[in-house]
């Protein structure tokens, strides 16, 4: 099946229906995966899928749909139905599609190495059996993906991508006797990521997966903050790379369409100002495994620095968001971000904490519009006088996300690279534990 030909036929079908502007994406994905279930290899399979996404505008009214039947007859039916859907949509002069954009990206291993997948799965199982036998891999996957797409618009844009990459993921818990002999279970945790070279390192050493599995075995027995610290206190958190990615997602949301259009962004009028610790340098990496520098609305996404020594350099409204707000359009991609490593070795970063916790996962819910939040810290360990101690249970922290970005006092030299993001450990002061 010729994806470009399908996309061209779809554009023609929408034009026949009188669309003023349109965008189509024809895509095909081939997935090969080795699955692990309950610490045993369970399934080897290959699947293929195809999809066509249609978007049409009639008199400022937008409608979109997806279909898996890519025959000319199905395209005609879908285009007609889309016009009917648009008739019931609200008019919005900000709706539009890209014009004159062009790029062709081909990158990564396009053919699957099945032996690399089976070797990676076997290495994960061997690591679990020898290093973390009390931990169960509830679900695990070693996979190869080949993803192709052709994006065309009525404005003459043509953006194509053909990407290949490998993925690993592990999800599990640990179970064993506590100090009193009672069998207990840890909370769940997970890890994983994408790479273009699966054989360059052991599977357990990638994406922090091995460390995550070890930490689960230490989390069978937990303590509350009353046992560890005597009760409520104000202290520091050391955010793991996964928790740092969660923290930065709030920042991304603040500079994207929803917050900018609603007026709830705390940063809309602060471009050029220092909004975070001078230790923070946040930039794009839109050439990471499985990532193409193409925005969802059909624009080439150039390299971007969002934070430079804590200074906010730009907002990131989409084409629609820019037309809605009057702000400059900045094309971006959802994943592919990196925070620069710091000068502090991780061991020193931990030793600098008087009282606090290493936070594996940060569950903040939906922070208030000003950044206030109250959340549970998960897969976390107490730090007392620089020593990492017991796993914590039922522990909450209260604070403000914007303040956390400003209160970063150390950034580790080490980072974890999952493909979609590359993050260090970050120490933040002044959080309230309860």
Please tell me what each predicted stretch does.
Residues 1-292, 308-309, 347, 385-387, ...:
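Active-site bordering "gate/hinge" segments
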Residues 230, 254, 268-434:
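Dual-mode signal for accessory low-complexity, basic/Gly-rich regions
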């Amino acid at each position: 099946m010729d994806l470009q030909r399908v996309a061209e036929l779809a554009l023609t079908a929408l034009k026949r229906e009188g669309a003023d502007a349109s965008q189509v994406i024809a895509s095909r994905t081939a997935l090969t995966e080795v699955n692990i279930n309950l610490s045993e290899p369970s399934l080897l399979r290959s699947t293929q899928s195809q999809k066509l996404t249609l978007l049409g505008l009639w008199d400022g009214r937008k409608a979109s749909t997806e279909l898996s039947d890519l025959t000319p007859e199905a395209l005609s039916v879908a285009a007609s139905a889309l016009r009917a859907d648009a008739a019931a949509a609200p008019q919005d002069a900000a709706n539009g599609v890209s014009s004159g954009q062009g790029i062709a990206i081909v990158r990564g291993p396009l053919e699957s190495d099945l032996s690399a997948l089976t070797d990676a799965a076997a290495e994960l199982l061997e690591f679990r059996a020898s290093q973390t036998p009390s931990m169960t891999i509830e679900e695990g996957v070693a996979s190869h993906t080949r993803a192709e797409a052709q994006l065309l618009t009525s404005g003459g844009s043509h953006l194509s991508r053909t990407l290949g990459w490998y993925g690993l993921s592990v999800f599990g818990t640990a179970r064993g006797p506590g100090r009193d002999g009672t069998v207990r279970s840890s909370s769940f945790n997970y890890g994983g990521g994408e790479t273009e070279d699966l054989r360059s390192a052991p599977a357990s050493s990638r994406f922090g997966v091995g460390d995550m599995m070890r930490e689960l075995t230490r989390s069978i027995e937990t303590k509350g903050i009353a046992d560890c610290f005597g009760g409520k206190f104000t202290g520091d958190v050391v955010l793991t790379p996964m928790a740092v990615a969660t923290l930065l997602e709030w920042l991304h949301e603040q500079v994207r369409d929803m917050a900018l259009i609603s007026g709830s962004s705390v940063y809309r009028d602060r471009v050029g100002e220092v909004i975070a610790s001078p230790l923070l340098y946040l930039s794009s990496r839109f050439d990471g495994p499985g990532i193409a520098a193409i925005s969802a609305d059909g624009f080439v996404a150039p390299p971007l620095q969002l934070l430079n020594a804590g200074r906010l350099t730009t907002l990131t409204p989409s084409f629609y968001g820019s037309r809605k707000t009057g702000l400059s359009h900045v094309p971006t991609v959802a994943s592919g971000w990196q925070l620069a490593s710091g000068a502090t070795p991780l061991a020193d970063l931990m030793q600098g904490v008087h009282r606090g916790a290493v936070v594996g996962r940060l569950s903040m819910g939906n922070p208030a519009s000003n950044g206030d939040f109250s959340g549970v810290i998960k897969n976390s360990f107490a730090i007392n006088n620089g020593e990492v101690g017991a796993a914590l249970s039922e522990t909450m922290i209260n604070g403000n996300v914007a303040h956390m970005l400003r209160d970063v006092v150390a950034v580790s030299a080490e980072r974890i690279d999952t493909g979609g993001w590359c993050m260090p450990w970050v120490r933040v002061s002044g959080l309230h534990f309860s």
